[in-house]
Amino acid sequence: MISLDLAVMEELADCYKAVDSGRAFQREQGFVQWTEEYPNLETLRSDITCGKGYAVKVDGAVAGYLCIDFDGEPAYDTIDGAWRTKGPYAVVHRMAFDRVFRGMGLADATFSRIEALCGARGVRNIRVDTDFPNLRMQHVLEKNGFVRCGVIIFQGSEKIAYDKTLP
């Protein structure tokens, strides 16, 4: 069974293992979106402390990690393009899965659960960004109904900005 749960501090090491696995996977794909400095252990610790860190679990085991922020993203205030969505939105950052769990369709399952979480909170819009070389994430986003809206600057580099409006 796949679940999306608020991460707790006792899961920090497993969540970071998923992020570190994602970082290595990016390098295997020939690009660097995440450096050794970001996201780091303190980034995840802060996410979890603030109630924004989520663990993707398979049969209770941490298989992935992501940040879901319902407070918006200041970097999204300026876009070369235009957001299609207005009003409150959730931001998805730092989605990664442990290598052991790859190939199970977890990204699609996770987005389905993110949408359910947003619906339960009355939030109908989701925004995400990714690097230009991250073709896999672009494919996952587009397959899950996200639409390219333009380019934003996040942490000093250009990212492709996507959004999705929920029914």
Task: Indicate residue ranges for each PLM-predicted region.
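Conserved GNAT acetyl-CoA-binding A-motif
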Residues: F111, C118-T130
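A short beta-loop-alpha structural element at the N-terminal edge
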Residues: S3-K17
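Conserved beta-hairpin
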Residues: K52-D69
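Conserved acetyl-CoA-binding loop-helix of GNAT-fold acetyltransferases
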Residues: F97, G103-A116, H139-K143
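Conserved catalytic-core motifs of GNAT/GCN5-like acyltransferases
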Residues: D129, E142-A161
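Conserved acyl-donor/pantetheine-binding loop and adjacent beta-alpha core of acyl/acetyltransferases
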Residues: C67-R94, R99-R102
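Glycine-rich phosphate/pyrophosphate-binding loop shared by adenosine-nucleotide-utilizing enzymes
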Residues: I2, A61-Y65, A90
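Conserved GNAT-fold acetyl-CoA-binding loop/helix
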Residues: R23-T43
